[in-house]
C-alpha cells in the first residue's frame, strides 16, 4: 500500500530547508547506490560529511518521529539516516528496486520494509520529477506538495521521471517496520484509523475499548521488536 502523509514539515520549515540546501555541497547521487541502481541513476545528493547535512537529517528524523499518521502507517522500528537529493536539467532515476538491507550507524544493519520521500519543492516549480511506483495495485505517479511525504513498500519497482524545468529537491529514507508483512501492517493501519474515527464521533465506549484491545493484541502477536 502507498500512503500520503501530509504536513510533515510546515511551510516555514520547508522554506528554511530550501534556503539552507541552496548553500549545501552536492555530490554525484551514485555514491550511495549499488551497481544496479548506478546504471540508471542521474541526480545529486547532499554530501553526508558536511555539518549542514547532519543538522538537516536530524530535523527530518524529529519531524517524522513526531507525526502521528506516519507512526500509525509505518509502525517504525528503525529509521535510516535521511538523505537529500536534487534533480534538474533532465536528471532522472530509472526503474530500480531498493536493496533489501542497509547499513545503520547504531544497529549495524536494518531491513528495508518501507521507502519514504519527503518533498521539499513546490510541485508547480518544476516539470516532470514524478515518483512512479509499480506495485500489485498498478502504477502510481506521485508529485506531492512541499512538506508532504509518501510511504510505499521498498519491494516495489520505482523511478523518478526526468525533471525538464526547474529543480526538484527531496529527502528520502527507509524504514524497518515492527510489522514485516505489508498486508498485516495495512490491516492494522485501517483498524487504527477506524478506531480514531469512532472515538472522535462517539467518544469512549466499551465497543471502542474492545477494538483497541484487539488492535494491541494483533500488534503484540505480529510485531518484531
Curated annotation (Swiss-Prot):
InterPro entries linked to this entry: Oxoglu/Fe-dep_dioxygenase_dom (IPR005123), PKHD_C (IPR041097), PKHD_hydroxylase (IPR023550), Pro_4_hyd_alph (IPR006620), Pro_4_hyd_alph_FE2OG_OXY (IPR044862)
Domain of life: Bacteria
UniProt xrefs under PROSITE patterns: FE2OG_OXY
Record keyword Cell membrane present: no
MF terms (GO), sorted A to Z: 2-oxoglutarate-dependent dioxygenase activity; iron ion binding; L-ascorbic acid binding
Chain ranges of the Fe2OG dioxygenase domain: 78-177
Name of the protein in its database record: PKHD-type hydroxylase YbiX
Organism: Escherichia coli O1:K1 / APEC
